[in-house]
Amino acid sequence: MTQLKKLYRKLSSLPAIAGLLLISASWAWTQAPAQPPQTDTATKPGASQPEQDQKRATGNASTQEQKISSKEAEELFRDVDDILRFASKDSGLPIKKEVKRRLTSRDEVVAYLEKTMAEDKDAQRLRRSELVLKKFGLLPRDFDLQTFLVALLREQVAGYYDMKTKTVNLLDWIDIEQQRPVLAHELTHALQDQSFGLEKWMKEGDNDLENKKQPTGMDIENDEISEARQAVVEGQAMVVLVDYMLAPTGQSLLASPQIVNALKEGMLVGTADSPEFKDAPVFLKEELTFPYRYGLDFETELLRTGGKEKAFAATLSNPPRTTRQIMEPKTYLSGESLEPMRLPDFERDFKNYERFDVGAIGEFDVAILVDQYAGTEASHNFYPHWRGGYYYAARPKGDPSAPLALLYVSRWASREKAAAFAAIYAQSLDKRYKHVHAVAQEGKDTLDDLQKLESLSGTHTWLTEEGPVVIDVKADSVLITESLDQPTTEQLEQELFGAFVATGK
């Protein structure tokens, strides 16, 4: 559906995002149930100014920003070892070496993150992501993704564990009481790193199709590995964070489902002090919080069914491969294997086009798309029926200003679900294009009133200001092309759906 994978991989390479982007949205909750375990602490200069502390915790810069004292910094440095021991006991992951620690300023962190973003090899992927996302209607056409991310970094920057230097970075502008639960989360990453080599472990799932001339069905199947692994890493860290916050009450994550639900709800809402996140498009909120929300649910289910060993070390040794396995842990536990998707001959079929992007459209991607165009309830009822999907984006050769052309193929659990998804996608056209007109077909009603559609079968075409949109539904599969010339669309239909046409299915 977009380069979703590559967009998230790009974001997750930034430590502050991978660390605690969403934690700032849950400060209200983390302060409510209990104070975290702690050593004796001196009174903080900012303790009588909770509103200011809250603002600092979410990362909003202020000309009056207060710094923690040298005594508080020393105390926080000592706390690292205590919290590391808690994280080790809670996760079962051993402490193999001391974790380096460093106190850093907001300016240093922001400069580091901006440098990482500018130099990262995925910078071009990010720009491609933006255009494909806009084609699917998941970002407004005038939205500047790069500007948004820079602003978000400044707003949401938080403490983080740096996998390259093996150092946990503590922040000199956030009250130490608020940094302790952050440390529980980040030191879990340090433990993961010590046992499994986190940077290499994540790269093993970094499956980029950009340089493959002819991706295979297995390539598409493996295209979500990085998201699934990120959800495991963040889900485990969230388990430890929740248990750390609940420890003074004698409770734990498994015994407090209502608290977990409240935390997850808060992740998507943000706070009054996080305007960039609060005002972000739905897609970005969902995408940025996916590994935390769904990762937490995934790990909770593994804890419930298999205990600590299964939820932590065993899952890091044998990680899930798709967002479907994260969203539906039973599919991971049962070892479900879906048949790879059939792919066309991209080089031949798109001989008149320059490839722009290609990738999987997984269960989570579909959940966001359906949520945006049919609502959250419909999304929750719909995404479990996903059985595969991919997209291919291209531009006509010699015409870089031409609209982005798109092929999207999806497979569903039944004919009925395929027909229902096709209708939802057709309904999105009115929201994504200024002018949409159904092409009359002999013997068929003209589908101009898209919002009345409940299901769609057969082949249908609409004209838009960016060219034709074709939706072809055959059995349990849906083929969609946008801004693609008719001969290419017909060739793709014949290649992928020829067997259905021949048998009349």
Question: Which sequence ranges carry the predicted segments?
Answer:
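Catalytic Zn2+-binding segment of zinc metalloproteases
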Residues: 187-203
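Compositionally biased, proline/threonine/alanine/serine-rich low-complexity intrinsically disordered stretches
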Residues: 29-74, 505
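Bacterial N-terminal signal peptides
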Residues: 15-26
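Acidic helix-start/capping segments at beta-turn-to-alpha-helix junctions
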Residues: 96-117, 204-214, 254-265, 319-321
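Auxiliary, metal-adjacent structural segments of Zn-dependent hydrolase domains
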Residues: 77-168, 172-177
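Pan-zinc metallopeptidase signature
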Residues: 254, 263-403, 409
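C-terminal soluble interaction/assembly domains
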Residues: 389-505
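Short pre-active-site segment immediately N-terminal to the catalytic Zn-binding motif
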Residues: 168-184, 225-228
